[in-house]
Regions:
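Sec-dependent N-terminal signal peptides
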Residues: 4-13
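Intrinsically disordered, low-complexity segments enriched in glycine/proline and serine/threonine
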Residues: 5-6, 22, 121, 219
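Short glycine/proline- and aromatic-enriched beta-strand/turn motifs that initiate or cap beta-hairpins
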Residues: 17-78, 218-228
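Solvent-exposed loop and beta-edge segments used for protein-protein assembly and interaction
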Residues: 19-21, 58, 74-76, 107, ...
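Predominantly the C-terminal beta-signal and adjacent terminal strand-loop region
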Residues: 22, 36-42, 48-52, 158-228
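Gram-negative (and chloroplast) outer-membrane scaffold detector with strong preference
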Residues: 29, 33, 60-147, 166, ...
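Flexible, solvent-exposed loop segments that connect beta-strands
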Residues: 35-56, 88-109, 138-161, 196-207
Length: 228
C-alpha cells in the first residue's frame, strides 16, 4: 500500500511539473471622452428631454489591479487573469441646459470597486469587467464657475448615489519574463448605467448615464518564466 502511494505521488510530480499560474498586479490609467445622457421617465411633471443636449467631456482614473493569472501555454505570454479592480475614477456628465442657457458638467470623484478578467495571447490583449463607482465628492461646473460638492451636498442633489458600470478593452501588450512585467495600450469602452437620480424634478424621474470611449495605458507586474 505504501509503495502504491509513493508511486502515485511520483507520477503526479512527473505529470504536473509546471505551475498553473502566478500572482498578478497592475496599474491602469483610462483616458477617455464621455458622452452623457439623461434617462427621463414622465409622470406628469415638467421635465423634458428637449431641454438638454449631451456634450462630450473628458474623464479618467487610476486603478490598481490584483489577482491571479492562469497559464495557457508554458514559458510564453499566454494566460488569463482574474483581477480585483480598485482605485480612483472621475466621472463627468456634460449637458447644454437650455433652461438656464449654459453648459453644465456634473463631476463625480468616485471610489471604483469591481472585477476584471483579462486574457493575453502573445501580444494581443482582451478584457472585460464590471462593478460600481461610489462618488465621495465632486463639483458642478458652469459659466467658468466651479461649485465644489462634498458627499453631503451631493446627497442633497442626487438619490441612488452609486454608478454601476461595465467595461471592455482590446489592444496590444508586451510582457518580458526577464523584467517580471510589461505594459499595454488598449482601446477602452465603458458604459455607466442609469442609476444616479436627480432630485427636485418630481413626479418625473431623471437619471444620469454615459458612454465612454478612449484609451487605457497599463503597467503589469508578474512573471510567466517557469521551470519545466
Amino acid at each position: 500500500m505504501k509503495k502504491s502511494i509513493i508511486l502515485l505521488m511520483l507520477l503526479s510530480v512527473n505529470l504536473f511539473p509546471q505551475k498553473i499560474g502566478f500572482q498578478s498586479f497592475g496599474l491602469s490609467i483610462p483616458l477617455v471622452g464621455s458622452l452623457a445622457d439623461y434617462k427621463i421617465e414622465k409622470h406628469g411633471g415638467n421635465v423634458s428631454k428637449e431641454n438638454y443636449e449631451s456634450k462630450s467631456t473628458f474623464e479618467g482614473g487610476l486603478l490598481l489591479k490584483a489577482g491571479y493569472s492562469f497559464i495557457l501555454k508554458q514559458n510564453e505570454p499566454y494566460f488569463i487573469s482574474l483581477l480585483f479592480d480598485f482605485g480612483y475614477y472621475r466621472d463627468t456628465f456634460g449637458f447644454m441646459n437650455y433652461i438656464n442657457n449654459r453648459k453644465e458638467v456634473n463631476v463625480f470623484d468616485s471610489l471604483n470597486m469591481g472585477f476584471f478578467a483579462e486574457g493575453l495571447f502573445g501580444f494581443f490583449t482582451l478584457g472585460f469587467g464590471g462593478g460600481i463607482k461610489v462618488p465621495l465628492g465632486g463639483s458642478l461646473r458652469y459659466d467658468n464657475i466651479i461649485e465644489l460638492l462634498n458627499y453631503g451636498r451631493l446627497k442633497n442633489r442626487f438619490d441612488d448615489l452609486y454608478i454601476p458600470y461595465i467595461k471592455f478593452i482590446i489592444g496590444l501588450r508586451y510582457d518580458s519574463a526577464y523584467a517580471g512585467g510589461g505594459s499595454s495600450l488598449s482601446f477602452y469602452f465603458n458604459y455607466d448605467f442609469q442609476k444616479i437620480k436627480v432630485k427636485g424634478v418630481e413626479p418625473d424621474i431623471q437619471r444620469l448615464c454615459s458612454i465612454d470611449l478612449g484609451v487605457q495605458i497599463g503597467f503589469h507586474f508578474g512573471s510567466y518564466e517557469y521551470i519545466d
